[in-house]
Amino acid sequence: SEDDFIKLCIELDKLCSYKFILHCDIYDYEKCLTMKNKLSKLDIDVIKPTNQLIQMFSNINQCDLFIAGSTGPLHVAGSLNKKTVAFYPSKKSSTSLRWTTINDKSNRLAYEDSGTDDKYIKKDIRWIAKDIYDKLLK
């Protein structure tokens, strides 16, 4: 959910000083602007979406860490061997085993929801942020 990503950015910012860039499709642009406003104390930008795949690939290639709930852009990041963090809902058809990225194992983390409601990640966001920091950003 938006709130989970906001909490994750806040918790990661407590651990390290990174610039956050929100990248989205045209349908989620307003949501990203709202998230940016809620995260105004952080160093954060929103990339205006285009329909240009080359632009999306370029944006992903420039990042240090790519966090996504959507496997399409996540697989692009994985194919570039970027550090990736994936979130998978608690559905038989959406497991990390099935949809894992092809980047080096040391460059990827995946979190699967353990709840029955597939809308939100049920894990502790503070713990996830610490895990991301310890395994991918330290």
Model-based region annotation:
Residues 2-89:
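Donor-binding and catalytic core of enzymes assembling or modifying cell-surface/extracellular glycoconjugates
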Residues 75-137:
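Nucleotide-sugar donor-binding patch of glycosyltransferase catalytic domains
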